[in-house]
Amino acid sequence: NAQPPVERKEIQVDPSLSRGSPSDRYKNLVEEYKTMHSSANRMFNGRSLVKFTDIIHSFVSKNKCKTLLDYGCGKGHLYTDQYSTVSDQIDKPVNEIWGLESFRLFDPGYPEHSELPEGKYDAVVSTDVLEHVPETDLIWVLDEILNYVDKMVFLNIACFKALKILSD
């Protein structure tokens, strides 16, 4: 059962785009996420992070990280007392598991976490986010992530059909 070769295509980036001037498609997706967030408490609650808890813990420990930014955190329930509503696979919030002194949550689609972070963090994690960023905006989003980090970045980019249907 040989798989057919993967069709590769060059991505179309637009170097003129930035946080201050993103593509219209990016702006529309953020608005779509805001609507989806408000429709259900369980929507984008951070559950995709659960399966990476151990590996992130290993990287955070190895790199002696004490501060962390979750870029595209959704509601970020795994960092709060609501962690148990998301998963029974962990017994405390992930920031406690990872031994962090501080953490910051950022998600432009969720008003509670939509304020742009400032400063640097030892670690930046982003799970199941980048596959939704329009290709034209990828460079500035990746630059933004890299400008927040001092020690390590953990990116998980889903390469399978999404469970949620978005306009992207």
Indicate residue ranges for each PLM-predicted region.
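Short, structured coil segments at secondary-structure junctions
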Residues: 99, 148-149
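A conserved beta-strand element that flanks and buttresses the S-adenosyl-L-methionine
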Residues: 125
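Conserved acidic functional residues
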Residues: 107, 128-131
